[in-house]
Curated annotation (Swiss-Prot):
It is a multi-pass membrane protein. This is Transmembrane protein 234 homolog. It holds the Pfam family TMEM234. Its main location: membrane. Belongs to the TMEM234 family. It is found in: Membrane.
Length: 140
């Protein structure tokens, strides 16, 4: 049996990296679109709780602006589960979740949402740096 010093480090394959990036993009880039697609949801008012539930469900399922990004987001979850089967859990989870934030911020900015300036960019830089360190730790 090999000792830990004699084991060959597992390299991260391109499939793993691309899958994690795809998941982060599918989750992160759809968040601002889901938010936009649900505009008007909070103004719905009904006389009963059941009536309120019906109004909310009907509102959401009849808006393609909400449903399309939601479906893409959920397909990202399927890609995530498939990625977990092939990659290391301690690499996939933090990288996908942290990069989701980055892609959410980028997409929101591209859609014209106002952001708090340097704090967002500082946070994105730290997230990317942490993701790189996490990936390098798994490769070395």
């Amino acid at each position: 049996m090999d000792s830990p010093e004699n084991t060959v480090p597992a390299s991260v394959d391109i499939y793993a990296v691309l899958s994690i990036l795809l998941v982060a993009i599918m989750w992160g880039a759809t968040n601002p679109f889901i938010k936009r697609g649900s505009i008007g949801y909070n103004e719905l008012k009904a006389d009963s709780k059941l009536g309120q539930l019906w109004l909310e469900v009907r509102f959401l399922i009849t808006r393609w602006q909400y449903l399309l990004p939601l479906v893409i987001n959920q397909l990202g979850s399927i890609v995530y589960v498939l990625t977990l089967q092939r990659t290391e859990l301690s690499l996939t989870v933090p990288m996908a979740n942290s990069l989701t934030f980055v892609f959410t911020a980028i997409t929101a900015r591209l859609l014209g949402e106002r952001q708090s300036g340097w704090k967002i960019y500082c946070g994105m830089t730290l997230v990317i740096l942490g993701t790189v360190i996490c990936g390098l730790d798994k490769m070395l």
